[in-house]
Amino acid sequence: GVAFGTVAHPTARLCLEWLHDHNLEGKSVLDYGCGSGILAVAAKKLGASRVLGTDIDPQAIEAADYNAEVNRADASFYLPEDMPDEKFDVVVANILSNPLRLLAPALLARVKKGGYLVLSGILERQAEELIEVYGSYRPDSPLSVWKSMDGWICLAGQIH
């Protein structure tokens, strides 16, 4: 498997575990709000065929590019306005619950039919509200709590 230090925040660990527990072989993955690119690098190492990351912070893009290079992971990172217009088998977003709420339509639009949306950066008490928000856009594709760790949760669901 992929080894990362125990320093990772619980939300990053939850997302890493989700990626690890699902077969990414030949799949496309978008790391939305990629930060240093840890999830994108992991997805590539776990067999994803195409991996993109996006972040609003230009310094994050630089850090992610660097981390992908040193880990020999073929992943590309973009500012949101430069992102190619495509859909992905897996969209993972480890950001905070407020931006996740506002980004619901944008994130859902990036998931291929039958693909998965994986969200973290969410406190247990925020889960219900986010499940409702995403459900209001896609009643046919409910998200649910996949796992929790130290008061943080990971929501995931298949988008139909």
Can you say where each PLM-predicted feature lies in the sequence?
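Short glycine- and Lys/Arg-enriched binding-loop motifs that mark or flank ligand-binding interfaces
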Residues: 1-3, 29-33, 111, 117, ...
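S-adenosylmethionine
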Residues: 56-160
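Conserved SAM/SAH cofactor-binding pocket of Class I
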Residues: 2-84
